[in-house]
Amino acid sequence: MRSISVLFLLIMILSCPLSAKSTAEEQNLYNECNKGNGKYSSCTKLIEILSKKCDSGNMEKCDDLGYVMGLELGMREAAFVPLEKSCKAGIAASCFNLGIHDIAIRGNVKRAAHNYSIACEKYSERLEEERIFKLKSCALKTALENCLRDQEEHDPVKCAKKAFWEISDKYDSNSTKE
C-alpha cells in the first residue's frame, strides 16, 4: 500500500496540476480544491467544468480531469477514463501518468510499457521541461519490456516498480544531461 501512495505522490510532483491554458475560474477552483479549505464543492465544480470540456473533445482538459480525479480526490479508477482518452489523442503527460497508474493500481505492466512508448514518442526533446519526461518514458518503456520478457524468473509488477524508482532516481539526480 505504501508503494501506491508513494507513486501517487510522485505523480503529484511530476505532473503539472492544470494545463497552461486553464481559465482563471478553473485555476481558482483548483487552488480551493487543492488547498483543502473545506471547499469540496470547488472540487466537484472543477470536475464538472473539466468533464464538459473533456467530453466536447478538449484533450488537455481530459488530462487535467484525470489529474484532479486521481490525485486530488483519490478517485484513481475514475481517473483512468480521461487519462486514457487524452493519451489516445497523443497527450504525452497523460500517457506518462497512465503508465504510473497502470503499474501501481492495475499491475498491468504490458499496458504501462505501451503508454510509456507513446509518451517517449510524443514528448519533445527540444523543450527543456519535457526532455526529462522523454528520457524517463523511453527508459521505462525498455525496462518494462525487459520485465515482461523475464517474467518467468520474477514478478513483472515488482520488477516494473523497481525499474520505475531506479529510472526516476537516475534522471532526477542527473537532471537532463543523460
Regions found by a protein language model. Name each.
Residues 36-39, 57-59, 72, 89-92, ...:
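Short helix-capping/linker turns of helical repeat alpha-solenoids
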Residues 31, 64, 97, 142-145:
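"A position-specific structural signal for the A-helix of alpha-solenoid helical repeats
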Residues 129-178:
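Terminal, low-structured helical/coil segments at or just beyond the last alpha-helical repeat
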